Design a protein with these regions (language model features):
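Short, electropositive alpha-helical surface patch
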Residues: 58-73, 135-138, 171-183
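Active-site gating/metal-coordination segments in enzymes
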Residues: 65-69, 73-75, 79-156, 207, ...
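Acidic (Asp/Glu)-rich catalytic clusters
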Residues: 38-42, 63-71, 112-121, 148-151, ...
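Short acidic/histidine-rich active-site segments
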Residues: 210-212, 242-248
């Protein structure tokens, strides 16, 4: 059993600057992760895909440590978050001097096939993200670069849709640029209860991922878990059960 979209650690971009009031406590993080990972093991889960982006607290050493402690397969990601909440300014600056799509392509391909920096740890999946109701030009650059990497290496792609929007557009851009639809999981689609919208996404042959169970209702401005389950049931009745993924 595999969970396709989880976060053992996560920090919104910029958290690294708050070492005074919000320092990282690794021992506390280990204890908290041991609690929920122990619960997963009771249900015979063996593999966890950690979808934390490069600039949002991704920590290959921590993931490797938790994999060893819990005797689980934990897969690390490579990629960036959606533009308003990420570190895109770095790439915007670099775009004045270089072909950033190619640089992003090389970065992700290297982290998948050689390793992340000098850690000796490889990523196993690409993680992309788009904004609420729009895909910005720089977000599209990342999608195109990931499609190129997938075409060459076969490594899978998982995505973040903000509030369940732009899923079909993500699938279109990725597949039009050569990505294999069977290796694409479009995430957070549980934020949308429009059955026709889900069918539009599924028409591309990609996976439709419902991965935010427990984060529901007015506090998170999302559908309830019951509404999400109703959507899954409706899609299964239409024959899409082989394209539906579920995670936390």
């Amino acid at each position: 059993k595999t969970l396709m979209h989880e976060h053992l650690l996560y920090g919104f971009c910029g958290f690294q600057g708050d070492d005074t009031l919000g320092p990282f406590d690794e021992l506390e993080a280990i204890r908290e992760n041991m609690k929920w990972l122990s619960g997963l093991k009771k249900y015979e889960f063996k593999t966890i895909v950690d979808a934390t982006n490069n600039e949002c607290g991704r920590d290959p050493f921590f993931l490797a440590k938790m994999a060893t402690i819990m005797d689980l397969n934990i897969i690390c990601s490579t990629g960036y978050y959606y533009e308003p909440a990420s570190a895109y300014m770095y790439w915007k600056f670099r775009s004045g001097f270089a072909d950033v799509e190619t640089e992003i392509y090389e970065m992700m391909k290297t982290e998948l096939t050689v390793g992340i920096g000098k850690t000796g740890i490889k990523a196993g999946v690409m993680k992309l993200a788009t904004s609420n109701g729009v895909i910005t030009p720089f977000e599209e650059i990342f999608l195109k670069a990931a499609a190129r990497v997938n075409k060459v290496t076969g490594y899978p792609i998982i995505t973040h849709t903000e509030m369940g929007t732009m899923g079909p557009d993500q699938a279109r851009i990725l597949t039009e640029n050569g990505a294999d639809p069977k290796s694409i999981s479009v995430g957070h689609m549980c934020g949308n209860t429009d059955i026709a919208y889900h069918e539009e996404l599924l028409s591309y042959g990609v996976f439709d991922c419902f991965d935010r169970f427990g984060l529901e209702g007015d506090l998170f401005h999302t559908p309830t878990d019951e509404e999400r389950c109703d959507v899954i049931a409706a899609l299964m009745k239409k024959g899409y059960e082989d394209q539906i993924l579920m995670s936390h």
